[in-house]
A protein has these predicted regions:
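Lectin-like carbohydrate-binding module/patch detector with strong preference for beta-trefoil
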Residues: 1-147
Length: 147
């Protein structure tokens, strides 16, 4: 499966990553260096809707603590049938929405484009902090080598 980097369109020097490769780790903005590292590469399966951590494919993006307004995005052990772990990005670019909470999209919290800032699900508002580009690692690597 092809790995992807989920790049912020608010600041293209940043991407989505995790603080560690363990279940329960927070999803945050990270500095995009080269093709990303083990904590910032993702497998994206449009057939299932799972976005799994390339370094540990048993972990996927999930929503924790959803209160009707927002929820923290973490990586959690993949659980079949858990719709908070399913995402829709096909035909929705540049937004990535949650299947269980379809009005909610990945959002860079408080519009703060700084490394370490948390990623939440938040109601769609069209802001730059909700726009992402999914870059295939092989294509990104070729682009960097050609530069």
């Amino acid at each position: 499966m092809t790995a992807y980097v989920i790049q912020s369109l608010q600041n293209t020097n940043l991407c989505i990553g995790v603080t560690s490769t363990a279940a329960g780790s927070l999803v945050t903005l990270q500095v995009l260096s080269g093709v990303g590292g083990t904590t910032s590469q993702w497998n994206m399966d449009p057939n299932t809707g799972y976005i799994t951590l390339a370094a540990n494919p048993s972990l996927c993006l999930d929503v924790q603590g959803y209160d009707g307004q927002q929820g923290q995005v973490i990586v959690a052990s993949m659980t079949l049938g858990r719709t908070s772990q399913l995402w829709n990005w096909v035909g929705r670019a540049p937004n990535i929405s949650n299947v269980q909470y379809p009005q909610m999209v990945l959002d860079n919290a408080n519009n703060n484009a700084s490394p370490g800032n948390p990623i939440l699900v938040w109601p769609y508002n069209g802001g730059q902090n909700q726009k992402w580009s999914c870059l295939a690692v092989p294509a990104l690597k070729a682009m960097l080598e050609a530069a």
